[in-house]
């Protein structure tokens, strides 16, 4: 089992951010966490990575039961994370190669000399992800898509059991977005691939390699289940409080409004 949350709630600064979350992810499942801005997605990710602890309820992630075992770095080394928050913490003068290498130590920057095996692994990942050509370039000079590939290589360095991709294609143009989504499909289809949790508020990013979706709305689970059972006209119209029509193309969902927007 990858994770299990039973009746989990989170209170921060006197406000309930998450309420009564029930969620179970089995090994080899790939999930989408889908919700609008402010739905509580970031807070939920912070709990999964043990930066926050639940106010109430029971929670297990990768065999670690919150409140009963020591977490922190021990858990986070099993999780590969790609997020905008992480990107802002990295040293801009580091090369893409150094960024990837740092994933072996779950560190920001390098503070020890990597072994030959570690260096070869980083090179192999950068090659596999189509990023080797800019391995020696400073991180700050890379395009957003190139930065994301370096971050994904970093996330995979420690052979994580869970790979969390938090809105990884934000800021990319159409071509760069589709190329990175192709890379994510490639990763998901590899032998011994980690379970993937893909976080987004754009339905068109949801790929056929994802099995299930958790719909989060105002800190609560709106729905959870198979992708095509969750992303229906009826469910999404209720989720968005507006009529929605779902178009499927090559097993990917695209949303349109079922009625035109009118002025109030």
Swiss-Prot record:
Induction: Highly repressed by CodY. Its EC number is 7.-.-.-. The keyword Translocase applies. Keywords: ATP-binding, Nucleotide-binding, Translocase, Transport. The keyword Nucleotide-binding applies. It is an enzyme of class 7 (translocase). Residues 3-243 form the ABC transporter domain. GO terms for cellular component: ATP-binding cassette (ABC) transporter complex. GO terms for molecular function: ATP binding; ATP hydrolysis activity; ATPase-coupled transmembrane transporter activity. Belongs to the ABC transporter superfamily. This is Uncharacterized ABC transporter ATP-binding protein YlmA. The gene is ylmA.
């Amino acid at each position: 089992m990858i994770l299990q949350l039973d009746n989990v709630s989170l209170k921060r600064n006197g406000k309930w951010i998450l309420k009564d979350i029930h969620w179970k992810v089995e090994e080899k499942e790939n999930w989408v966490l889908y919700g609008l801005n402010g739905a509580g997605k970031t807070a939920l990710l912070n709990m999964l990575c043990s930066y926050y602890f639940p106010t109430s309820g029971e929670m297990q992630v990768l065999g670690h039961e919150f409140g009963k075992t020591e977490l922190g770095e021990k858990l986070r080394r099993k999780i590969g994370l790609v997020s905008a928050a992480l990107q802002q913490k990295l040293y801009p003068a580091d090369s893409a190669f150094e960024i990837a290498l740092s994933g072996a130590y779950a560190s920001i920057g390098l503070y020890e000399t990597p072994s030959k095996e570690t260096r070869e692994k980083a090179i192999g990942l950068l090659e596999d992800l189509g990023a080797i050509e800019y391995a020696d370039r400073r991180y700050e000079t890379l395009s957003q898509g190139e930065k994301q590939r370096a971050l994904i290589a970093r996330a995979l360095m420690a052979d994580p059991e869970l790979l969390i991709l938090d809105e990884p294609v934000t800021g990319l143009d159409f071509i760069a977005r589709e190329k990175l989504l192709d890379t994510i499909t490639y990763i998901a289809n590899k032998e011994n691939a980690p379970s993937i949790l893909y976080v987004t508020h754009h339905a068109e990013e949801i790929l056929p390699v994802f099995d299930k979706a958790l719909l989060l709305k105002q800190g609560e689970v709106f729905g959870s289940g198979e992708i095509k059972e969750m992303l229906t006209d009826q469910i999404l119209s209720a989720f968005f409080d507006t009529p929605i029509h779902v178009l499927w193309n090559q097993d990917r969902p695209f949303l349109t409004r079922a009625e035109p927007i009118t002025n109030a």
